[in-house]
Every structure is written in structure tokens, then in C-alpha cells.
């Protein structure tokens, strides 16, 4: 299985990484990026990870997986994990996870 990032998820990651570098420094950026990348690889290896949570109330088929202070919002298709958003834990998921977040180019 493989994964794809939506344009919104890609923008989320850029924002997270820029904030981390500015606020916490390059060393923390490298650590956090590795944690997020490891989480994505774990999701790809087992999309129904016990630590993931089904959130059909947000959008049918959506799961959330927590990484430190962020949640990866994704859904599983036949041969691909679609990552729609990477959201800060304090965000209002109901307004951030929508069909628009899962548009892939």
C-alpha cells in the first residue's frame, strides 16, 4: 500500500514544520518531522491501527491518528491511504475535515 497527501495536508505539514523551526528550532523540527513520517508509515502498514479512531461523524470512512499535538486525518481506499489533513489538536475538526480536504490532484 502507498499513501498520497492532499494539497491541504501538504500545506498543513509545511505550516507545522515552519512553526516548529521558528518556535522550537531545527533539532526539534527534525525530531517532529521524523515522528510524523513514522506515524504515516505505521498507518500505511496497518490503516486500522488500534490507536487510530474511526470518525464517520466527520466524513464517511475517515480515521484520525494522533501524533504528539497533531492528528492525521485519513481514509483508506483499495490500494492507497489518502491523507486529507494534519490538524493541530486544538482545531475544530468538524470544520476542518470535509470533502474539500480529500481532493487529490
Regions found by a protein language model. Name each.
Residues 2-58, 103-104:
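Basic, Lys/Arg-enriched alpha-helical interface segments
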Residues 20-23, 60, 78, 95:
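Residue-identity detector for threonine
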Residues 50-81:
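Basic/aromatic recognition patch in beta-strand/loop cores that engages polyanionic ligands
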Residues 70-71, 75-105:
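Enriched for short, Lys/Arg-rich terminal
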Amino acid at each position: 500500500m502507498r499513501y498520497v497527501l492532499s494539497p491541504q495536508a501538504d500545506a498543513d505539514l509545511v505550516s507545522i514544520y515552519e512553526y516548529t523551526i521558528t518556535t522550537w528550532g531545527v533539532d526539534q523540527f527534525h525530531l517532529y518531522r521524523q515522528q510524523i513520517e513514522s506515524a504515516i508509515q505505521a498507518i500505511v502498514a496497518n490503516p486500522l491501527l488500534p490507536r487510530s479512531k474511526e470518525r464517520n461523524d466527520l466524513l464517511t470512512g475517515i480515521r484520525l491518528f494522533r501524533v504528539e499535538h497533531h492528528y492525521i486525518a485519513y481514509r483508506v481506499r483499495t490500494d492507497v491511504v489518502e491523507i486529507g489533513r494534519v490538524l493541530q489538536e486544538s482545531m475544530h475538526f468538524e470544520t476542518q475535515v470535509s470533502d474539500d480536504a480529500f481532493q487529490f490532484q
